[in-house]
């Protein structure tokens, strides 16, 4: 038992034999369409929950629960949780798995059969009244970044996340300016908070085994929901959409200078106001520098 295991929660986690039996009983096969690679190692899911710091007081969102390996490890802490699963047969089977392997957790669990890219506070009201909630997930590799940015945009109270993603994606999400892999995901995520890679996961803990290694990314949101640099003196906030538009344009032509990449939307006066050299490339700018450029752009157009 780890420190995250709630002493009042009875049950056990899924091993390889359990996963294969559940899949066979339900007629489920992992599909590339939904990026399904099911975790078959109890030690790995407990490690994820431990890194996430989940406790019995938490309300947890899981995206892509699959057959329930990580789900059971989260419930083992005593936490309350909602799982969003896109695949109907998998979503239908999940409550049965919880009832079989951890029956006393049934009342703390709900599954929603929906594409995570379509969720919002209206169609997923479970978290509406929470001051803050956490995301813990083994995300489908092909849509991991869009899911994270979509959830952060739509749920102001998504305070932290611990996700397992493809190692290459994890490196991009947590990278700093100046690197070849620093890009749109890195800088947009930095608008909301800080991210770091906190571990690497081998391929042999999955069924089927993926062709790439995985890694864990831990994210903590800024108290105000965005980088403090976006706060204006009058209490307003620099427009996020303007900042993201500049990011998209700068990285859309990342080998060009800022002057060349942004010439259609940023006049030279804005670079001057922001104190940013237009001969630099977008890949060298921090999120706070993109914010400064967006603020300067607003000031130029307002004058």
Swiss-Prot record:
Its main location: cytoplasm. Belongs to the class I-like SAM-binding methyltransferase superfamily. rRNA adenine N(6)-methyltransferase family. RsmA subfamily. Keywords: Cytoplasm, Methyltransferase, RNA-binding, rRNA processing, S-adenosyl-L-methionine, Transferase. The gene is rsmA. It comes from Bifidobacterium adolescentis (strain ATCC 15703 / DSM 20083 / NCTC 11814 / E194a). InterPro entries: KsgA/Erm, rRNA_Ade_diMease-like_C, rRNA_Ade_Mease_Trfase_CS, rRNA_Ade_methylase_Trfase_N, rRNA_adenine_dimethylase, SAM-dependent_MTases_sf. HAMAP family: 16SrRNA_methyltr_A. Pfam families: RrnaAD (PF00398). NCBIfam families: ksgA. This is Ribosomal RNA small subunit methyltransferase A. Its EC number is 2.1.1.182. It catalyses: adenosine(1518)/adenosine(1519) in 16S rRNA + 4 S-adenosyl-L-methionine = N(6)-dimethyladenosine(1518)/N(6)-dimethyladenosine(1519) in 16S rRNA + 4 S-adenosyl-L-homocysteine + 4 H(+). One of its GO terms (molecular function) is 16S rRNA (adenine(1518)-N(6)/adenine(1519)-N(6))-dimethyltransferase activity. It is found in: Cytoplasm. It comes from the Bacteria. The keyword S-adenosyl-L-methionine applies. GO terms for cellular component: cytosol. It is an enzyme of class 2 (transferase). Specifically dimethylates two adjacent adenosines (A1518 and A1519) in the loop of a conserved hairpin near the 3'-end of 16S rRNA in the 30S particle. May play a critical role in biogenesis of 30S subunits. The lineage of its organism: Bacteria, Bacillati, Actinomycetota, Actinomycetes, Bifidobacteriales. S-adenosyl-L-methionine binds at residues 37, 39, 64, 85, 115, 138.
